[in-house]
């Protein structure tokens, strides 16, 4: 019976959602459908995440476009960015799990080891945007942001792979490293002249960064000498971790798709054998940053099925996506479940799409249309967005 239900649901998903928003015969025979009372989309004017509380749950807040450029220079999920471009604004919903996370971050004890917060949930529930809500909070309150927007990009489809000059057992990814350095500089430029490196770093026979030099010189080395970009990333992470307890800055380590650090890669050596994640210099250094053996900040991680390699599409629990090695490496952590929309959140999202004329079908704004969208999407944020986009 379960198999039959599963097949039925999969067929429903494949149908054109417009066919469900039908014009019934009875409706055409009756008088004109009475217009529904106007509703105002649930919004808050507070664009500062620090001011968000339980009273804002389910409301949308606007990320200033300037913040979008500096805090998220790499962009946000593609379909979300399509909405930003279409609507001319970047709005995030204030959700209960994000409020829980913000509460923890507001009360961070910087004298204690960094706490690891792990966002998990089924596919499409909004883990990435909840993580971005936390990143925006920290950026607005002068934290130094070390953000990896998609760790899976480091373990597959690498554009260039070189043997490490620092360690012959590992491999460098200069293009991925230089891209990350560019975005890191955009977000944290005000810190790069203040933080001084604690060691001398030799890049080649002619170039070196002297002890006491601004950290920005290391970043520039990676940007101007792309071959050194991977080593530059390693130096940046090492220096930030070593200096985080000095009180010069508060450090947020945010990694989306952290399960990629302990999964399998698609990258191959010259003998055609697969490269293990720990053989990649970027992964090796990032694993050090998600350890809780440093002070002066917090670690916010998310699990992701999107882009995950060789994992079941239905897997979403930490032990399923991290595996034994990854789970043991991150334990202890504080898990935060990101669920599907509750009724209030669904209604807020639905009204937001209506307000922005994202729903063009004539029956979409009716109670019948609302119920069918709720049924088809199962209140899953990603599925709701995809259904609404096709209407």
From Swiss-Prot:
Cellular location(s): Mitochondrion
Q: Which GO terms describe its biological process?
A: apoptotic mitochondrial changes; mitochondrial translation
Start-end of Basic and acidic residues biased regions: 45-59
Q: Which GO terms describe its cellular component?
A: mitochondrial inner membrane; mitochondrial matrix; mitochondrial small ribosomal subunit; mitochondrion; nucleoplasm
Q: Does the keyword Mitochondrion apply?
A: yes
* Residue numbers spanned by region Disordered: 30-59
Question: Looking at the keywords, is Glycosyltransferase present?
Answer: no
According to its UniProt record, where is this protein mainly located?
mitochondrion
Task: Name the EC number(s).
Answer: 3.6.5.-
Q: Which domain of life is it from?
A: Eukaryota
Which reaction is catalysed here?
A: GTP + H2O = GDP + phosphate + H(+)
Quote the transit peptide annotation as a residue range: 1-17
The modified positions for N6-acetyllysine read: 168, 200
Q: Which UniProt keywords apply?
A: Acetylation, Apoptosis, Hydrolase, Mitochondrion, Ribonucleoprotein, Ribosomal protein, Transit peptide
Q: Signal peptide span per the entry?
A: none
- One Pfam annotation, family name? DAP3
Give the protein's function. Answer: As a component of the mitochondrial small ribosomal subunit, it plays a role in the translation of mitochondrial mRNAs. Involved in mediating interferon-gamma-induced cell death. Displays GTPase activity in vitro.
What does the subunit section of this Swiss-Prot or TrEMBL entry state? Component of the mitochondrial ribosome small subunit (28S) which comprises a 12S rRNA and about 30 distinct proteins. Interacts with DELE1. Interacts with NOA1.
Q: Which family does it belong to?
A: Belongs to the mitochondrion-specific ribosomal protein mS29 family.
Q: What is this protein called?
A: Small ribosomal subunit protein mS29
Output the lineage of the source organism. Answer: Eukaryota, Metazoa, Chordata, Craniata, Vertebrata
Q: Gene behind this chain?
A: Dap3
């Amino acid at each position: 019976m379960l198999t039959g239900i599963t097949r039925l649901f999969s067929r429903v998903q494949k149908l054109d959602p417009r066919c469900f928003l039908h014009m019934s015969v009875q409706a055409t025979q009756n008088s004109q459908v009475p217009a529904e009372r106007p509703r105002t989309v649930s919004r808050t004017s507070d664009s500062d995440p620090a001011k968000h509380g339980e009273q804002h749950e389910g409301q949308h807040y606007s990320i200033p476009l300037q913040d979008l450029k500096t805090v998220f220079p790499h962009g946000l999920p593609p379909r979300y960015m399509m909405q930003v471009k279409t609507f001319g604004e970047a709005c995030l919903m204030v959700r209960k799990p994000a409020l829980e996370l913000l509460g923890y971050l507001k009360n961070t004890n910087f004298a204690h080891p960094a706490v690891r917060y792990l966002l998990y949930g089924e596919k499409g529930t909004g883990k990435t945007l909840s993580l971005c809500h936390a990143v925006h909070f920290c950026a607005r309150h002068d934290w130094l942001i070390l953000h990896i927007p998609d760790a899976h990009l480091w373990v597959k489809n690498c554009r260039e792979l070189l043997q490490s000059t620092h360690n012959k057992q590992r491999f460098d990814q200069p293009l991925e490293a230089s891209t990350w350095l560019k975005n890191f500089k955009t977000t944290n430029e005000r810190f790069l002249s203040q933080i001084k490196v604690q060691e001398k770093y030799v890049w080649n026979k002619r170039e070196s960064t002297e002890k006491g030099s601004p950290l920005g010189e290391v970043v520039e080395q990676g940007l101007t000498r792309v071959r050194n970009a991977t080593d530059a990333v390693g130096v940046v992470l090492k220096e930030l971790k070593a200096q985080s307890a000095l009180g010069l800055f508060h450090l947020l380590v945010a990694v989306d798709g952290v399960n990629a650090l302990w999964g399998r890669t698609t990258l191959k050596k010259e003998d055609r054998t697969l490269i293990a994640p720990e053989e990649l210099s970027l992964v090796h250094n990032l694993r050090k940053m998600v350890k809780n053996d440093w002070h002066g900040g917090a670690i916010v991680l998310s699990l992701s099925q999107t882009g995950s390699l060789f994992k079941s599409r239905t897997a979403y629990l930490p032990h399923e996506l991290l595996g034994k090695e990854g789970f043991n490496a991150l334990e202890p952590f504080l898990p935060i479940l990101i669920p599907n929309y509750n009724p209030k959140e669904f209604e807020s999202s639905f009204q937001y799409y209506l307000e922005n004329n994202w729903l063009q079908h004539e029956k979409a704004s009716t109670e019948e249309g609302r119920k069918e969208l709720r049924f088809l999407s199962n209140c899953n944020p990603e599925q709701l967005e995809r259904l609404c986009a096709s209407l």
